[in-house]
Structure formats: C-alpha cells, structure tokens
Amino acid sequence: MAPRFVLITGSSRGLGRSMALALAQRGFSVLAGVRRRQDGDDLRAEAGRELTPVILDVASVESLAMARTEVERLTTGHGLAGLVNNAGLAWFGPLEQTPIDVIDHVFRVNVSGVIATIQGFLPLVRQARGRIVNISSINGRLSFPFASIYNASKFALEALSDSLRVELAPWGIRVAVVEPGATRTDIRDLAVRAWAAGRASLAPDQRALYETPFTKLTQLIAHLDSTAADHAAVVEAVYDGLTSDVPRARYLVGEDTVQLMQLATLPDAERDAALLGMIS
C-alpha cells in the first residue's frame, strides 16, 4: 500500500501535537511541522518512524521554501494526501490599544502564513488528489469583544477556505474547516497568556478604562474548561476531513460551539446585548 503523507503545521504542542501523534497511529505518514528541532525530536521519540519532523515556520518565506524542498524529498513522488493548517496564535485585548505590530504578526501567522503554506504545498496536494483541512475557531463564526484581531483572522480563514473549496474542486481536492471552541489543556494556557499579555501591554490609565471587562472575561476564561472539547474530538474531525468520502465543509467541535452558534444567528441587536452582558 502506498504511503499516505500528511503535513501538519504547528505540531510542537497542543492540538497540533495531538493530531500528529493520532494520525501517525492511524496509518498516515505524518510530516510534523515544528519550529524547533528539539520539539521534533520529542515527537519522533513518542510516535516512532511513522512521524518525521520538518522544520517549518509559516511566518518565514525562507523556512517555507526549505520545508517544501524537504517534503518533496520525503514524499518521493507520492505527493501529500493531506495538508492540515494548524499553526496559529491568539491575541486578546481592546482594539483601541492593540499595537499595529501585534496585529501584523497575528495576521502574518493566522492568514498570510496559511496562504503561503497552501501556495507552497498545493502542487504536492494536487499530485495525490489530497485534502486540505484548515483549523479555524468558533471565533471565525462569532465575533467576541476584546478578541477583534483574532476574530478577524479566523473570519478571513473561513472566507479563503470557502473560495478555495470551489477553486480546487475541479481537481478533486476537498477543503474542510474545523471550528473548535475551547479545548482542554490549551484554553487556559493560550487564552490566559494572550489575555495577560494584552493587559500587561496597557499603561495604568488605559487599563483602568477596561478594568470591568478585563475582570469579567478573566473569570469567564477560568471556567471554560467545563464545556471544553477534548483534543480527541478535534482529532476525529480532522481525520474525517482527511478520509471521508463526503467530508463536511465545516466541523463544529465542542458543546460550547453549538450554544454559541445559536447566539451567532440572533439579530444583531440581540446578539450585541448578550455579548455585552458577558463583559459588563
């Protein structure tokens, strides 16, 4: 049986690591994109020979070019059965006081980095008539206050996925989007760190302007684990997107996403009032 190669960006930790290990166990030859060699060595030690680390920073044109050369060598004419765009980062804080360089970096990773990765590896996906799975978020369907930059980057990912799904259909290439809500083990680390960084970047007088919503949202984040999705649920969605004869265009993952999508469908005024109630 010919090997089924799948490239996963952002495999060093969290969801990306879980995906890489699980797909290696399910018969894929996983090419795990990592930024540090040590992270790759750790993954390889745990997964065995079905996983090969590839140094890949989606925000670096040079790194992408080198990774493309390496992946071509590793796949030896088989192409990519799957490309999973998982690398991403979060930033939370008032839009008014978010530095432009932070905004640029979030979009460089979450949007431009995904586009550059697809552009670089699409010939290999086409060669295998493979699949593309983009890891988005419920934030790509519902805009939360104080997450405007992250929201915008995920809405952009949803839009480009919709366009790409139609553009690539003539070659039999399927494009799916996975939309997790809070995920266990990641949510406190990522959300609290990003939230703390946003808060710490403010001058004391600026911080005072937003003290109430900061306090409310900090409490909300601390309780998100109660409805957080297990990594396994996200992995299942990715696996289905890579293997199903009829993959979905979108996979909502987690109990919280079902509830939040109900909120997203409300009239604007009602939705705004509900969101305002969370922060005031």
Where are the regions that the model predicts?
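C-terminal beta-strand-loop-alpha-helix "lid" module of Rossmann-like NAD(P)-dependent dehydrogenases
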Residues: W171-A222
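Conserved glycine-rich cofactor-binding loop
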Residues: S12-R13
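Conserved NAD(P)H cofactor-binding loop of Rossmann-fold oxidoreductase domains
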Residues: N86-W91
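Substrate-binding pocket helix/loop in short-chain dehydrogenase/reductase
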Residues: P94-L95, V102-D104
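Residue(s) in the substrate-gating loop at a strand-loop-helix junction
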Residues: S137
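The beta1-alpha1 cofactor-binding region of Rossmann-like NAD(H)/NADP(H)-dependent oxidoreductases
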Residues: L56-T69, I100
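Active-site helix of classical SDR
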Residues: I118, S153
